[in-house]
């Protein structure tokens, strides 16, 4: 009896001190070290804004080209002195440009937005930003005061396989990362 009781007590103690396993995981942290940091804002016709109005496009064609700039915020002297930079773009893209991310019955079909760097200097650019060309490199002999772009709604060259062209709302978002070199 004593041996049985001792075995029960020792067995209970062994289980009482056992640690429970917990799930593990991984956390990713990203950062960037640059020689210049500053706030970059989109600007249309001298007005800083985070929304670019592409206007309207006829269902049979293209919209009007809308010019805008990415400019360092006032007082960003470190950034305003740089002559070389690159801008990496990401978003919902295809080989033509940026996709329409609007959904539902009111979404336009068969259209995309082109985005083109227009003042790259001696750098690489001038082509539409798309899945094959996501970076515009700026190489200037004097300080880069702004990164100039044009955006335009365009009818896809190929007819959509999901019911053809349809008038409606066009919405897309693009993220950019400026790296000064």
UniProtKB/Swiss-Prot annotation:
It is found in: Fimbrium. One of its GO terms (cellular component) is pilus. GO terms for biological process: cell adhesion. Coiled coil: none annotated. The record marks 154, 158 as: Required for receptor binding. Disulfide bonds join 38-79. The keyword Disulfide bond applies. Belongs to the fimbrial protein family. Fimbriae (also called pili), polar filaments radiating from the surface of the bacterium to a length of 0.5-1.5 micrometers and numbering 100-300 per cell, enable bacteria to colonize the epithelium of specific host organs. This is K99 fimbrial protein. It comes from Escherichia coli.
